[in-house]
From Swiss-Prot:
Family per record: Belongs to the polyribonucleotide nucleotidyltransferase family.
Keywords: Cytoplasm, Magnesium, Metal-binding, Nucleotidyltransferase, RNA-binding, Transferase
Cysteine pairs bridged by disulfides in the record: none
Catalysed reactions, as listed in the record: RNA(n+1) + phosphate = RNA(n) + a ribonucleoside 5'-diphosphate
Name by which UniProt lists this protein: Polyribonucleotide nucleotidyltransferase
Organismal lineage: Bacteria, Bacillati, Actinomycetota, Actinomycetes, Micrococcales
Organism (species): Leifsonia xyli subsp. xyli (strain CTCB07)
EC code: 2.7.7.8
Chief subcellular location: cytoplasm
Gene3D superfamilies in alphabetical order: GHMP Kinase, N-terminal domain, K Homology domain, type 1, Nucleic acid-binding proteins
Length: 761
């Protein structure tokens, strides 16, 4: 029996002194019933399967393209058995959902307009090497399987992850393609760029057009920059976009080579144009002039009400024309799309010709800003940030490091101490809708805000807390995610988190059109929701006054010239500087921690003392926690974290930990208020401090009975009884002999028997 015909193509990406990475695409061996199936390999050890399928018939009454992207993480890929009760994979991890979004965002605009057949792309992680990320490889796999599927898809598109690793004087700084997780620890910036290769009019290859960008400064970037590494400012980020182009070109070439051998012919899928030219002309004739006035109303609600009223009038007029036979009956089903298209022309034309936006602002103007902290009682930190009609509430909660998130996924990242959760309730846009578990968009927005702030967080040693930041979008009219970054900076400072620098974010938009035979671009600062919906780009940039901490770019175009993006980056910095001044006016330094926040301190103990501190079955550590009311957690390196609701409780626990793990040798003559823990025929054992017991011999017990003979220690002392004792002898093995301190002796020594702990005799 003959086996399947297997074809492959590969790209070798040269990383200079860091070696090379090989990306290989293979088809024909597995998943042969899918319209397109490609196995993508990274250096032969990481393997993904991407399968693209399409329904046979278009969906009726759909006015959008029904594309679904799913990422399936298989535990066997990393040699693991799932940790769930049923020992099988459940719902997608947060990391898998984020990769779904990375694939969907550049692929969706690459399908032909008007396609209504359901298309599903399933990427399954079959094998992953330790220290590797699979997200950028998944973008390429999804594009390759779609490219050979016979669907009307204007690919290939390619994605590459780059890390900027400083040369530290010995070498030049270098952008490394497909870096390992360990290499990211040495990097100051992490960048995922997706693009396509344009074709010139003469059929030759043109420039690489950028379709999507995800980027962030790394967790270690601050320390690296302080040590002399390059700051990832706007110029450096623009260089990174250029550095990605050769790698994208190679990956696109490999996909094209595979498609040349294996692609199916483009099938004849029905395409449903959103409207006919006749419908568009009719709507434009009825609505254009009034829309010009509507899109000069600054207030969102007032503008929406005027727009809705006009829309109803135009629709009624269109219905009359259709009823009279002057217009095709399908015009009514095409009306909404045609009306939106006319609205887009009105808005874009005014911006490009006059440089004036919907609310009357210029291209670089920011809406009114407002910032306020400490607005919610009892929480550890809170703030409200408002930019125009976008209003975000930020709330910070602090806890011990043992509350950090443990991540069970195929990502090299296994735990996170900073969690950022974003909520977008329906009332934020004046609507009704479902509330409950977060949707993919909310997860993505929260992760973007998280990435923006991680580079400026204090280290675990400087601030030993787990931090949960929640952003509530209370009102939305453009870029709630960047508003979340600003509100979070305020809230974290209000909670007493010593940020290394404040961070602000701004959303940039892009309008492009052919005016007088020339393609013009206009970058918009601080876009409205309508400018996002009717524009060509959503470009979010967050950072400090010195460097960029996070970027997210989405576009509805086939690609954007990198020169346009570089200009938008510089424009975003000016806006960011303005916002940072407003944040600084609201709070310019960390506040004192709230009384309701836990106090966490740390103690370093020898590793060989960890077992002694824990005690048999946790007896010792539990006793300290019960006695002091503190929570204690221990890291493998001997770092002990102590958390309590107040400082004295934490200090009491630290003192007891030090007695056990960092002990000072007890001396004869020291006095302790101890606790009787065991009675024997020859005396009583008294606990002086956790892990330190001494023997009160029966001959010494007699002193407590006035010198009379004692038949049983139980007649004089009971378990749990407090007794003031003095160390009288320490033998060669460290065993302690005790004697009771009688009332007259205690008075002589001036000892307050109400306080526990050692006292000098």
């Amino acid at each position: 029996m003959e086996g399947p015909e297997i074809t492959f193509a590969e790209a070798m990406l040269d990383n200079g002194r860091f070696g090379a990475r090989t990306v290989r695409f293979e088809t024909g061996r597995i998943a042969q019933q899918a319209q397109g199936a490609v196995a993508a390999y990274l250096d032969e050890e990481t393997m993904l399967l991407s399968a693209t399928s399409a329904s046979k018939h278009p969906k009726d009454n759909f006015d959008f393209f029904p594309l679904t992207v799913d990422v399936e993480e298989r535990s066997y890929a990393a040699g693991k058995i799932p940790g769930s009760f049923f020992r099988r994979e459940g719902r997608p991890s947060t990391e898998a959902i984020l990769v779904c979004r990375l694939i969907d965002r550049p692929l969706r605009p690459s399908f032909v307009d008007g396609l209504r057949n359901e298309v599903q792309i399933v990427v399954t992680v079959l094998s992953i090497a330790p220290d590797e990320f699979y997200d950028a490889l998944a973008i390429n796999a999804a594009s390759a399987s779609t490219q050979i599927s016979g669907l009307p898809f204007s690919g290939p598109i390619a994605g590459v992850r780059l890390a900027l690793i400083p040369g530290n004087g010995a070498h030049e700084d270098q952008w490394v393609a497909f870096p390992k997780a360990s290499q990211l620890e040495e990097a100051v910036f992490d960048l995922i760029v997706v693009g396509r290769v344009l074709t010139n009019e003469d059929g030759t290859e043109g420039d690489v057009a950028i379709m999507m960008v995800e980027a962030e400064a790394t967790e270690g970037s601050w320390n690296l920059i302080q040590g002399g590494a390059v700051k990832p400012n706007e110029e450096v980020v623009a260089q990174g976009l250029e550095a990605a182009k050769p790698f994208i070109r190679q990956l696109v070439g490999a996909q094209a080579a595979l498609a040349k051998q294996s692609a199916k012919a483009i099938a004849d899928y029905p395409v449903f144009l959103p409207y006919s030219q006749e419908t568009y002309d009719s709507v434009a004739a009825l609505a254009y002039d009034e829309l010009v006035n509507v899109y000069q109303i600054a207030d969102k609600v007032e503008r929406q009400n005027a727009d809705d009223a006009l829309k109803e009038r135009v629709k009624a007029a269109l219905a009359e024309k259709a009823q009279a036979g002057a217009l095709d009956a399908e015009a009514l089903t095409q009306f909404s799309a045609a009306y939106k298209s006319v609205s887009k022309v009105v808005m874009r034309g005014r911006v490009l010709r006059e440089g004036v936006r919907i609310d009357g602002r210029g291209l670089t103007d920011i809406r009114p800003l407002d910032a306020e902290v400490q607005i919610i009682p009892r929480v550890h930190g809170s703030a409200v940030f408002q930019r125009g009609e976008t209003q975000i509430l930020g709330v910070t909660t602090l806890n011990m490091l043992k509350m950090e998130q443990q991540i069970d996924s195929l990502s090299p990242v296994t735990k996170k101490r900073y969690l950022h959760h974003y909520n977008f309730p329906p009332y934020s846009t004046g609507e009704t809708g479902r509330v409950g578990s977060p949707k993919r968009r909310e997860i993505g927005h929260g992760f973007l805000a998280e990435r923006a702030l991680v580079p400026v967080l204090p280290s675990r040693e400087e601030f030993p807390y787990a931090i949960r930041q929640v952003s509530e979008a209370l009102s939305s009219n453009g870029s709630t995610s960047m508003g979340s970054v600003c509100a979070s900076t305020l809230s974290l400072l209000n909670a007493g988190v010593p940020l290394r620098a404040p961070v602000a974010g701004i959303a940039m938009g892009l309008i492009s059109d052919v005016i007088d035979g020339e393609t013009r671009y206009a970058a918009l600062t601080d876009i409205l929701g309508a400018e996002d919906a009717l524009g060509d780009m959503d470009f979010k940039v967050a950072g400090t006054s010195e460097f960029v901490t996070a970027i997210q770019l989405d576009t509805k175009l086939d690609g954007i010239p990198s020169s346009v993006l570089a200009s938008a980056l510089k424009q975003a910095k000016d806006a960011r500087t303005t916002i940072l001044s407003v944040l600084d006016a609201a709070i310019d330094a960390p506040d004192e921690m709230a009384p309701t926040a836990p106090r966490v301190i740390s103690v370093q103990i020898p590793v060989d003392k960890i077992g002694e501190l824990i005690g048999p079955k946790g007896k010792t550590i539990n006793a300290i926690q019960d006695e002091t009311g503190a929570d204690i957690s221990i890291d493998e390196d001997g770092t002990v974290y102590i958390g309590a609701v107040d400082g004295p409780s934490a200090e009491a626990a630290r003192a007891q930990v030090n007695v056990i793990a960092n002990p000072t040798n007890p001396e004869v003559g020291e006095q302790f208020l101890g606790t009787v823990v065991k009675n024997a025929a020859f005396g009583a054992f008294v606990s002086l401090l956790p892990g330190k017991d001494g023997l009160l011999h029966i001959s010494e017990v007699r002193k407590l009975a006035g010198g009379k003979r004692v038949e049983s220690v139980d007649d004089v002392l009971s378990i749990g009884q407090k007794i003031l004792v003095e160390i009288t002898k320490i033998d060669d093995r460290g065993k302690l002999s005790l004697a009771p301190v009688l009332a007259d002796e205690a008075e002589t020594h001036g000892h307050d028997a109400a306080s526990e702990g050692p006292t000098e005799g």
